[in-house]
Amino acid sequence: MLEVKDLHSFYGAAHVLHGASLQVAPGEVVALLGRNGMGKTTLIRSIMGLTPPTVKQGDVIWKGETITRMKPHDIANKKIAIVPQGRRLFSSLTVTEHLTMFKSARATEGWTIDRIFSTFTRLGERRHHRGNQLSGGERGMLAVARALMQDPELILMDEPSEGLAPVMVQHLEGVIAELGRTGLGILLVEQNLYSALAVSSRVYIMETGKVVHSATSEELAKDEGAVQRWLGVHG
């Protein structure tokens, strides 16, 4: 289980996280919602040990071990993977070469390239295409697939559906839901309320650097008006 306890993170002198706390259990898909600038990406980066920001108070605990302030490489070796914003790819490498590069040296089973291509059928069709030949949706799928090749037990996804066409969003939602059923824990940063409710079992809502509400997706689905007010969504 991932436990984040009272985390305070800073960008220089700017206090960005103000005591954020949450949990992700094995096989649980947890959505982290909030408007831009509320600290969602900062929280993801703090969990993964990426700098900036700088964590000055609080703890990140993974499977009973405190990993706060560990180096990102050491955290990745704990079988935690990240799908960051930006979807940066190597323009000269093919889809297959990207996956081979990210294959975990520790893994003896789990995610293979064949399994990736059966899960992400579009990537299979484009396996020989280079990074600069992929659409935005295909790049997003490849970013998720690369993380899976590390054979993680927990994956942190920072707005993986951003900029995707509706058909690609629907496909990604199906993949995320299926991953949760395999026992993979997922912390999913989202701004799309409906995507979050479609795949998650629990939702945390962030505002000004802290978690201000937590509920099951079923509970929030019954109180959509309240969620829209919290997120500043109208209409």
Protein language model regions, located:
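Glycine-rich phosphate-binding loops of nucleotide-dependent enzymes
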Residues: M1-G235
